[in-house]
UniProtKB/Swiss-Prot annotation:
This is Glutamate receptor-interacting protein 1. May play a role as a localized scaffold for the assembly of a multiprotein signaling complex and as mediator of the trafficking of its binding partners at specific subcellular location in neurons. Through complex formation with NSG1, GRIA2 and STX12 controls the intracellular fate of AMPAR and the endosomal sorting of the GRIA2 subunit toward recycling and membrane targeting. The lineage of its organism: Eukaryota, Metazoa, Chordata, Craniata, Vertebrata. Palmitoylation of isoform 2. Keywords: Cell membrane, Cell projection, Cytoplasm, Cytoplasmic vesicle, Endoplasmic reticulum, Lipoprotein, Membrane, Palmitate, Phosphoprotein, Postsynaptic cell membrane, Repeat, Synapse. Residues 840-856, 947-973 have a biased composition (Polar residues). Residues 53-136, 150-238, 252-336, 471-560, 572-657, 672-754, 1003-1085 form the PDZ domain. Residues 752-802, 840-865, 942-980, 1108-1127 are annotated as: Disordered. It is a peripheral membrane protein.
Length: 1127
């Protein structure tokens, strides 16, 4: 019963066969048209009459393969009634059945009898010139039932033709002007074998040469003069099936096709209502399925030619489709109905308005009118689409679509300026492109010293826009390729004075799915090769070459609207949404979010629909989606609501003043500072947190440093951008990375708050002496902290990093480093920081710097001890005179090391240690602790003579320099009411995390063993950390005697820096060293002690095994991997 009612609701959609097209000959091309057509064509009205000259060459004794009927003694004028398959006339692709022959070699046939015409054609000679008249193809107008789309087709010449006949073209009489129309496709020819082109299609361009405004003769000449391979831009028609859009149940679609021709549909499987169903996955452009307009991506295939697909596999369904005859009957459930079943849980309700969308109303306008909705793009969901967004196709039997010559805008529909562009073009194509290029060059020149992304200009319809660029990587699809087409200069060989534009994006192609590309975007470079100084043909060739590797990288320039940029308050943003294409926004829930708090936009994809509006910014609050409030929605629910939206998405946004970079709205002063470091430090310390939208603050300046000397940077200033990279929505670690990669010239965008804002700001930046930063300044020591509760003794600060050290080039030793701690005294207790060095090392001299802020090591206090320590202050016990004397001593030692060429390594050690410890502290410690009195990376700035870090050189018996790197001290957050169990747990976790690990530098000279002809050690690449490490050491060999240990990292080999090398580069250096080998190595003592505790057997030292070696946890998670090399 269900099946019966199911069938009764099916509607029938019938498509005519493509052979019923008025431009298509019969398959054999041997039958003349019927008598009715012959009588109708006896006289062509003057306004529909076209003419051309056909030149044929034949050898003596051969015929043209042409059958002519008519004459003065017959009914009608001489006309072509048949073209023999394979004959000269047929292969010329200039004649069609039904053409009238007016003259042969200048001889008018108006008064010739039929037999005289035949005799003339036989005896005319080798060169035959025919004057031919034909009926102009009818005009096809885009309306409610037909839409235009374009497709790019690449064909190879056969002889000197592509296997199709063209008619139409521009004419002096406007009533006779037509686009260049393909009226016949020769069976078996190149176009027929390729299968895309059908009679009635319009030829828009050949190898980028636009045919708009060209005559028929000029179009023929362009086709003849192009190369053996040409790319043709074809426009075809797709019918709009209202019955599909309004259907409430299954449909029976009948599609007629030529036997053996492909329908152009790719199938896949999906799950609907817990059952597997066969679904249309892709539809090939300009295929029969595309042109009929009844099939869409996502439609469920219920049956094929009466065979149910309920229990069929994908392979079986594909085979059924391939075996169909000239009449295909498909029972489908349209995709707009299937989406209802595929939607998420019912607790999310979305009600859509029945009002007409802007592009629906605009679709009925003339195709040459420009649109202000610059995000309108075609999607299969739309039953009607805007003109010139190139929707889907016309039924094969429809008359060839044409642009009416009488319409002043219709002919410009094919011009570049009338394309419906997603990007607002900088100017119309007719304006001077050199001016655009000059503005672009000036913009690039100014960009170096300015943080504005681009200067504002006026786009279409007077809208203010600015340009931005982005890089897009596309992976080709087997069916649709990349899915983009370019529009360039008039002549393919002409050098482009402005970049080519994207003129078409195919639906459901990689170009559309990436969500970044839109029609009208300028293609600046293809695979890194600029397009501005090349020809359009070269640009197209780059795209074709990329299709071989199925990957292309495009640099795109696009426009971002900025006519309306809300500075604060609540407003609505409407974004067009396409199926399977994301809007480009990422929403997140702050860790401190409470019920009723909004979600935050944490990322906006560059080039996406959301980005191009120019109104959305990182940090904006998302209040509602399509009038569904998100106050109590989780982030997952909000994402689901976004995904279920269709066609048009309405977002309710709230922008706070503190999230605005505008001076007028925020009341702040915003300016740009450019610093040239000339190899030195910047002299600034930045502070922040790992929360994306917490500010990055300048917390201290080095006295007399570069930043302080400018006079434009002050403590408390907020950094908005570093070298044009905005810090909005980025954590402190990202800002650190940007500073490290900044190079010699660093451009900072600074926001200086007003006094009122500074006073009322809830976030307080650390002041010198209480900052959680490592500085290289020489400020006065901080005052001793007053006794009080623990929340006062351990002030709340934010983690920070001294950019003066972070700015040094390169990455140092890839390990975590330990601390030579200072001594502190409290209430009669003396505590030392935990020292990992051996007793022998502790006897060496070590600097004890002046403390600026108090650090508190793990001292194992009991509950009572903790209570007692809250009532007493911590007093630093270092002697200032001794410290000053030791600073002078170690300053000389550092200078000595610099003269030996080791200063770069020291700086790298500092930088890497800083980054490692900072990131570890910020992530792990923040995970362990909670509460408002949390302080991360709290440490006193050290004297500049110590390069901003505590550094100790330890005299060893081998006279090798030993360098120990300090970690940052961390204050322990606590509340008075914390329980002892929690304190013990936190102390234990902090002890495990913050256990210091020293690093040693050694210079080793080895002499080759004369007996073994090697240096007695093997090396291996690091697995998790780059670099080359000592793996095994032969007992009593040169390496063992010289003091090498497993896990030693080779920093230099014979004075060649090998920090970034692998075994393939290091082994040849060692092999070329002869009998003497000079090494500079870095060592983690823990790894060496571990290797001593577990010595390798003598027989194991050179084994080439595949095992991975992992260093102990305090050694930076070092692992080595094959290949190993015995040296």
């Amino acid at each position: 019963m269900i099946a019966v009612s199911f069938k009764c609701r099916c509607q029938i959609l019938r498509r005519l066969t493509k052979d019923e097209s008025p431009y298509t000959k019969s398959a054999s091309q041997t039958k003349p048209p019927d008598g009715a057509l012959a009588v109708r064509r006896q006289s062509i009205p003057e306004e529909f009459k076209g003419s051309t000259v056909v030149e044929l060459m034949k050898k003596e004794g051969t015929t043209l393969g042409l059958t002519v009927s008519g004459g003065i003694d017959k009914d009608g004028k001489p006309r072509v009634s048949n073209l023999r398959q394979g004959g000269i006339a047929a292969r010329s692709d200039q004649l069609d059945v039904g053409d009238y022959i007016k003259a042969v070699n200048g001889i008018n046939l108006a008064k010739f009898r039929h037999d005289e015409i035949i005799s003339l054609l036989k005896n005319v000679g080798e060169r035959v010139v025919l004057e031919v008249e034909y009926e102009l193809p009818p005009v096809s107008v885009q309306g409610s039932s037909v839409m235009f789309r374009t497709v790019e087709v690449t064909l190879h010449k056969e002889g000197n033709t592509f296997g199709f006949v063209i008619r139409g073209g521009a004419h002096d009489d406007r009533n006779k002007s037509r686009p260049v129309v393909i009226t016949c496709v020769r069976p078996g020819g190149p176009a027929d074998r390729e299968g895309t082109i059908k009679p009635g299609d319009r030829l828009l361009s050949v190898d980028g040469i636009r045919l708009l405004g060209t005559t028929h003769a000029e179009a023929m000449s362009i086709l003849k003069q192009c190369g053996q391979e040409a790319t043709l831009l074809i426009e075809y028609d797709v019918s709009v099936m209202d019955s599909v859009a309004t259907a409430s149940g299954p449909l029976l679609v009948e599609v007629a096709k030529t036997p053996g021709a492909s329908l152009g549909v790719a199938l896949t499987t999906s799950v609907c209502c817990n059952k597997q169903v066969i679904v249309i996955d892709k539809i090939k452009s300009a295929s029969i399925a595309d042109r009929c307009g009844a099939l869409h991506v996502g439609d469920h295939i219920l049956s094929i030619d009466g065979t149910s697909m309920e229990y069929c596999t994908l392979a079986e369904a594909t085979q059924f489709l391939a075996n169909t005859t000239d009449q295909v009957k498909l029972e489908i459930l349209p995709h707009h109905q299937t989406r209802l079943a595929l939607k998420g849980p019912d607790h999310v309700k979305i009600q859509r308005s029945d009002r007409q969308h802007p592009w629906d109303a605009w679709a009925s306008n003339q195709c040459g009118v420009h649109t202000n909705h610059h995000h309108n793009t075609y999607h299969p969901d739309h039953c009607r689409v805007p003109a010139l967004t190139f929707p889907k196709a016309l039924p094969p039997n429809s008359p060839p679509a044409m642009v009416p010559s009488s319409s002043p805008t219709s002919m410009s529909a094919y011009s570049l300026s009338s394309l419906n562009m997603g990007t607002l073009p900088r100017s119309l194509y007719s304006t001077s492109p050199r001016g655009t290029m000059m503005r672009r060059r000036l913009k690039k020149k100014d960009f170096k010293s300015s943080l504005s992304l681009a200067s504002s200009t006026v786009g279409l319809a007077g809208q203010v826009v600015h340009t931005e660029t982005t890089e897009v990587v596309l992976t080709a699809d087997p069916v649709t390729g990349f899915g983009i087409q370019l529009q360039g200069s008039v002549f393919a060989t002409e050098t482009l004075s402005s970049p080519p534009l994207i003129s078409y994006i195919e639906a459901d192609s990689p170009a559309e799915r990436c969500g970044v590309l839109q029609i009208g975007d300028r293609v600046m470079a293809i695979n890194g090769i600029p397009t501005e100084d090349s020809t359009f043909e070269e640009a197209n060739q780059l795209l074709r070459d990329s299709s071989i590797t199925s990957k292309v990288t495009l640099e795109i320039e696009f426009d971002v609207a900025e006519s309306v940029i809300p500075s604060s308050g609540t407003f609505h943003v409407k974004l067009p949404k396409k199926h399977s294409v994301e809007l480009g926004i990422t929403i997140s829930s702050p860790s401190s979010r409470k019920p009723g708090d909004p979600l935050v936009i944490s990322d906006i994809k560059k080039g996406s629909v959301a980005h191009r509006t120019g109104t959305l910014e990182l940090g904006d609050k998302l209040l509602a989606i399509d009038n569904i409030r998100l106050d109590n929605c989780s982030m997952e629910d909000a994402v689901q609501i976004l995904q279920q939206c269709e066609d048009l998405v309405k977002l309710k946004i709230r922008k706070d003043e503190d999230n605005s970079d505008e001076q007028e709205s925020s009341g702040a002063i915003i300016y740009t500072v450019e610093l040239k470091r000339y190899g030195g430090p910047l002299g600034i310390t930045i502070s922040g947190t790992e929360e994306p939208f917490d500010p990055i603050i300048i917390s201290s300046l080095t006295k007399g440093g570069l930043a302080e000397r400018t006079g434009a940077i002050h403590i408390g200033d907020r950094i908005l951008a570093i070298n044009s990279s905005s810090l909005k929505g980025k954590p402190l670690s990202e800002a650190i990375h940007l500073l490290q990669m900044a190079g010699e010239t660093v451009t900072l965008k600074i926001k200086k708050q007003t006094d009122a804002q500074s006073a009322s700001s809830p976030k307080k930046f650390p002041i010198p002496g209480h900052s959680g930063d490592l500085g290289d300044g020489e400020e006065d020591p901080s005052p001793i902290q007053k006794p009080g509760k623990l929340s006062d003794a351990y002030p709340s600060t934010v983690p920070s990093v001294d950019s003066a050290v972070d700015s040094w080039d390169g990455s140092g030793i890839d390990a975590s480093y330990g601390s030579q701690g200072s001594t502190f005294q409290t209430s009669g207790y003396n505590y030392n920081t935990y020292d990992w060095r051996s007793p022998k090392q502790r006897t060496s001299l070590s600097p004890v710097p002046k403390p600026r802020s108090q650090t508190y090591p793990d001292v194992g206090l009991s509950n009572e001890d903790w209570d007692r320590s809250t009532a007493s202050g911590f007093v630093g016990a270092s002697d200032s005179a001794d410290a000053e004397q030791e600073e002078n001593f170690w300053s000389q030692a550092l200078e000595d090391l610099e003269t030996c060429g080791q200063s770069g390594i020291l700086r790298e050690l500092e930088e890497k240690a800083d980054r490692r410890v900072s990131l570890r502290n910020m992530t792990l410690l923040a995970t362990i602790m909670s509460g408002s009195t949390m302080s991360l990376n709290h440490e006193a700035p050290m004297a500049r003579s110590q390069l901003g870090r505590q550094a100790s050189f330890q005299e060893r018996s081998s006279s090798r320099p030993h360098y120990s790197q300090t970690t940052r001290s961390n204050t322990l957050p606590s509340d008075v009411g914390r329980k002892s169990v929690t304190l013990r747990k936190m102390k234990q976790e902090i002890k495990e995390i913050m256990s210091p690990t020293p690093v040693e530098l050694h210079k080793v000279t080895l002499y080759k063993d004369s007996g073994m002809e090697d240096f007695g050690f093997s090396v291996a690449d690091g697995l998790l950390e780059k670099g080359v490490y000592v793996k095994n050491i032969r007992p009593a060999g040169p390496g063992d005697v010289g003091g090498l240990k497993p896990y030693d990292r080779l920093l230099q080999v014979n004075h060649v820096r090998t920090r970034d090398f692998d075994c393939c580069l290091v082994v040849p250096l060692i092999a070329e060293s002869g009998n003497k080998l000079d090494l500079v190595i870095s060592r983690n003592p823990l790894a060496s002690q571990k290797s001593i505790e577990q010595p390798a057997l003598p027989s194991d030292w050179s084994e080439q095994n595949s095992a991975f070696f992992q260093q102990p946890s305090h050694g930076g998670n070092l692992e080595t991997r094959e290949p190993t090399n015995t040296l």
